[in-house]
Regions:
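Amphipathic alpha-helical "stalk" segments
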Residues: 1-140
Length: 140
């Protein structure tokens, strides 16, 4: 399916590029930049391959119209987080809330992903926001 192929080409590394540009002094961004310096070509190839698999999973959720509140979608977010933890930096509750706030206020993330794959631009930010509030509700 051509649409899913396009979605596979949207890698988490692209979101990382946006994040590192917007928050160059963030402690996690600094940590990730240090880790990235040591990656070999093989590491990069593996990271991209894993990101493609992740995006294929997310694309299937969109095609199947799976709501962000569904356990399959929540699993998609967990895969997203695991990818970041493995390749960039640890993701904790504070970071998830920061990412949720950033994606809800700054629409350039949604627009960026939407250009890459129809539906992904709205789905991923909504999924991040849902997961953040699942961890810590507004009134908690």
């Amino acid at each position: 399916m051509k649409w899913i192929k396009r979605a596979e080409d949207v890698t988490c590394a692209l979101l990382w590029k946006e994040w590192s540009t917007n928050f160059p002094e963030d402690r996690l961004v600094i940590l990730a930049k240090e880790r990235i310096k040591n990656y070999t070509r093989s590491d990069w190839d593996m990271m991209v391959e894993e990101a493609h698999a992740l995006n294929a999973y997310l694309a299937k959720l969109i095609v199947d119209k799976v709501p962000v509140t569904d356990p399959k979608a929540e699993h998609g977010f967990e895969l997203f987080a695991e990818h970041y933890i493995k390749w960039f930096f640890p993701i904790d509750e504070e970071y998830i809330h920061k990412l949720a706030l950033e994606t809800s206020i700054n629409k350039k993330y949604a627009l960026f992903f939407e250009k890459q794959a129809p539906g992904l631009g709205m789905y991923l930010p909504r999924l991040i926001i849902h997961y953040a509030y699942k961890l810590r509700p507004l009134n908690a």
